[in-house]
Amino acid sequence: MKSPAPSRPQKMALIPACIFLCFAALSVQAEETSVTPQPPDILLGPLFNDVQNAKLFPDQKTFADAVPNSDPLMILADYRMQQNQSGFDLRHFVNVNFTLPKEGEKYVPPEGQSLREHIDGLWPVLTRSTENTEKWDSLLPLPKPYVVPGGRFREVYYWDSYFTMLGLAESGHWDKVADMVANFAHEIDTYGHIPNGNRSYYLSRSQPPFFALMVELLAQHEGDAALKQYLPQMQKEYAYWMDGVENLQAGQQEKRVVKLQDGTLLNRYWDDRDTPRPESWVEDIATAKSNPNRPATEIYRDLRSAAASGWDFSSRWMDNPQQLNTLRTTSIVPVDLNSLMFKMEKILSRASKAAGDNAMANQYETLANARQKGIEKYLWNDQQGWYADYDLKSHKVRNQLTAAALFPLYVNAAAKDRASKMATATKTHLLQPGGLNTTSVKSGQQWDAPNGWAPLQWVATEGLQNYGQKEVAMDISWHFLTNVQHTYDREKKLVEKYDVSTTGTGGGGGEYPLQDGFGWTNGVTLKMLDLICPKEQPCDNVPATRPLSESTTQPLKQKEAEPTP
């Protein structure tokens, strides 16, 4: 039976189909030319499960990062022989057969450092090099040095790195920016995508796609040469995110791609595996067991996909904000992801033009225009007056306001009148004395109230400024910087997240204790310091009073967190 003629939107989506077909081969080629390292839960099978379930270590990531001292198959064979013998000591067996990750030395900054001096001094402390790794190490080698976030995070993370790189550039470390771009390009060439982090157990997923923005950042220093140099890797990453689109029918989803009923193409977060995460093994098993009405594999996939989003975890993905087992990440089309995909398409167009391929540049521009229309049609809640995620189950835009709603402004994909409404919604519902709330829901999860995260502060600040909403943008920067400074004055460190209901308090919630370091906070703090202080009078600490050159506002009273989305 002949299919009905496609509607006009479907035709628009099909115009650049050759791009998807051509680049689908690129990601396949990358995967076929290298042997993908196996994660520790596969390498060690029942031994890995038993060690994690025995809770030998306070942090499940410890054993996931442990390095086998010999062939894992031999270790597993020895374990099977010994495990039922009387007096068998699992902890002793692990200590004999594995090299556990070393605790990093606690960094003690010199006395009397300003905030800027402290951050500048941290860059070498947070720099790692893994050109060579042990044969069975879960750590993936990278050709150049890189900057890690800090704390328990001993490896490089994808989306964290962009905000870290903003700070490196602000400090004049363009060599480190170039090294990190080269490392991510290496991962794309080796694995077909940029994994969540450079660990074997992160290979089944990616994270918010900032690589094109990293290349664009490098181009500020190196010019169009950077765009031309990394165009092939940007194309491969785009192919990874759009993998399977050529076979999709209207109303279907495949991996990271969603095709809506009118042919609009959007993206979602996805993990290729549906098992517990090795770095959070026991926690994931407990979450799955707590909801016997859902298949465990479905819950595992949604947990992993939430990790791919960077927002692990948040009421944003959950039907019941108080029950993690109700999350359904894969049935939600995220507004921030699709904003980043729009930006990727725009940068690919620019890079193609720089490389002299105007035809390809036009095709990417067509894709970006189609996606922008999709964002405006499906990811805007007209009743509420803000951008939000789209629900594939209810076939409606969701009602919850989150800090992700500022991403269309950040990438210049928003309509001007909607940007004005976003400024009002942000100031009314998300802005707090210590910065921008992630959501207005208190769930106990770390990507919810009262936590504020540096990358979201910067996205909001830049996004609002893009549309002339400077007052709210400066409010966010000033409030967050005050929070960072107060915490630094008391504890002499920058942390992963902050409690924005007040100032001077690190954030809480989630699966692990608060981490210090901290890469993306360092980067955003430097950018904001240079934003709020006049160029003729740069500041090394946050001023005691708000600079007169910027608009001043009354201090915000703390808003009560809402119990439900």
Swiss-Prot record:
Q: Which GO terms describe its biological process?
A: cellular hyperosmotic response; trehalose catabolic process
Does Hydrolase count among this protein's keywords? yes
Q: Where in the cell is it found?
A: Periplasm
Looking up Pfam families in the UniProt record yields: Trehalase (PF01204)
Q: Name one GO cellular component term.
A: periplasmic space
Kindly list the positions annotated as binding substrate: R152, W159, D160, N196, R205, S206, Q207, R277, P278, E279, G310, E511
E.C. numbers: 3.2.1.28
The alphabetical list of record keywords is: Glycosidase, Hydrolase, Periplasm, Signal
The subunit field of the Swiss-Prot or TrEMBL record says: Monomer.
Q: Which family does it belong to?
A: Belongs to the glycosyl hydrolase 37 family.
Full protein name: Periplasmic trehalase
- The organism of origin for this protein: Escherichia coli O6:K15:H31 (strain 536 / UPEC)
Give the gene symbol.
Answer: treA
